[in-house]
Amino acid sequence: MKTFLILALLAIVATTARIAVRVPVPQLQPQNPSQQQPQEQVPLVQQQQFPGQQQPFPPQQPYPQPQPFPSQQPYLQLQPFPQPQLPYPQPQLPYPQPQLPYPQPQPFRPQQPYPQSQPQYSQPQQPISQQQQQQQQQQQQKQQQQQQQQILQQILQQQLIPCRDVVLQQHSIAYGSSQVLQQSTYQLVQQLCCQQLWQIPEQSRCQAIHNVVHAIILHQQQQQQQQQQQQPLSQVSFQQPQQQYPSGQGSFQPSQQNPQAQGSVQPQQLPQFEEIRNLALETLPAMCNVYIPPYCTIAPVGIFGTN
C-alpha cells in the first residue's frame, strides 16, 4: 500500500510538473501576439489548442485533490492492523485452555483403584468371615443361653426372694407353723414380689416360678439340716430378710449355690415340689394379677437330676 501511494504521488507530481512546464509557454505566447499583431491568426489555432490545453488549468483542482494526502485515511484503513491483533489475543485463549487440562488431570486420581483393590483382598476373606459369623452366632447363642440362666439365677437370688417368702408364708399358714411374718412385713413382701413378677417377661414367668419352688425346697432342706444340728433358729431366719426387703435382697445366701444345686433335687422330692408349685401357682398369679402360661404345670426337664 505504501509503495502504491508513493507511486501515485510521484505520478501526480509528474503531471503537475508537466502542467507547470506547459503553463509558461502560453504565457510567453500571449506576450508575443501583443507585440506581433500579424501573427495573431496563428496563435488562434494555438489558442484553440491552449484552451484545450488550458482546460487542465482548472483541473488544478487536483491540487486540493492531493489534499487526499490527508487522505492518509487509508492509514486509518490500515487500522485493521489492530484487527489482526485480535487473533493474537485469540490464540492466547488456547494457551489458558491447555492450562485447563492441567487442573483436569487432578481429578485423575489413580489412587482410587488402590482402595478399590483393597476390597478385592477383603473379598476372598468374606467366606472366612462367614464362617466366623456362623461361629460367632453359635457362640452368641450359647452366651445368650448362659446369660439367660445367669439372669434367672440373679432373679432367684435377688428379685424373687420376696415371692419365695410369700409362698413360704402361705405354706407355713397351711401347716400351722410358728414361723409366720408380721402383717406389715408380709404386705411389703407382697408388693415387692408383684413388682418383680411384672418386670419378668411372660415367657420367663413359668421358669421363674419353678425357680421359686426350687428355692423353697432348698430352703426347707437347709432348715432340716439346721434342726438336725440342734441350732434353734425360731424366727431368726425370717427376721433377717425383713430388714433387707427394701433393698430387694434377701438373707437366703445358700441360693448362690443354686446353679450347682439345681440338679440336686431328687425324684423322691417330686410330691413336695408339686405341692409347693401348686401353692405358688394358686397364690402368685391371683395376688399380682399376672398371667402364667398353662404349660407351667409341667415340671421342667433336668430339675430333678434327669436329662
Swiss-Prot record:
Q: Give residue spans, biased composition: Low complexity.
A: 29-55, 114-134, 242-260
Gene3D superfamilies according to UniProt: Plant lipid-transfer and hydrophobic proteins (1.10.110.10)
> According to its UniProt record, what is one Pfam family this protein matches?
Gliadin
What stretch or stretches form a coiled coil here? none
Report the domain of life of the source organism: Eukaryota
Q: Secretion signal: which residues?
A: 1-20
GO molecular function annotation: nutrient reservoir activity
Quick one: where's region Disordered? 29-134, 242-267
SUPFAM superfamilies in the cross-refs: Bifunctional inhibitor/lipid-transfer protein/seed storage 2S albumin
Repeat: is it a keyword of this entry? yes
List where Pro residues composition bias occurs: 56-71, 81-113
Tissue localization of expression is: Expressed in endosperm.
According to the record, the residues making up region (Sufficient to initiate the primary inflammatory response to gluten in Celiac Sprue patients) are 76-108
The UniProt keywords, alphabetically, are: Allergen, Repeat, Seed storage protein, Signal, Storage protein
Q: Which SMART domains match?
A: AAI
What does the UniProt record tell us about how this protein is modified after translation?
A: Substrate of transglutaminase.
Q: What further fact does the record state?
A: An internal 33-mer peptide seems to be the primary initiator of the inflammatory response to gluten in Celiac Sprue patients. The alpha/beta-gliadins can be divided into 5 homology classes. Sequence divergence between the classes is due to single base substitutions and to duplications or deletions within or near direct repeats. There are more than a 100 copies of the gene for alpha/beta-gliadin per haploid genome.
The family annotation for this protein states: Belongs to the gliadin/glutenin family.
What biological function has been recorded for the protein in this entry?
Gliadin is the major seed storage protein in wheat.
- Protein name (Swiss-Prot/TrEMBL): Alpha/beta-gliadin MM1
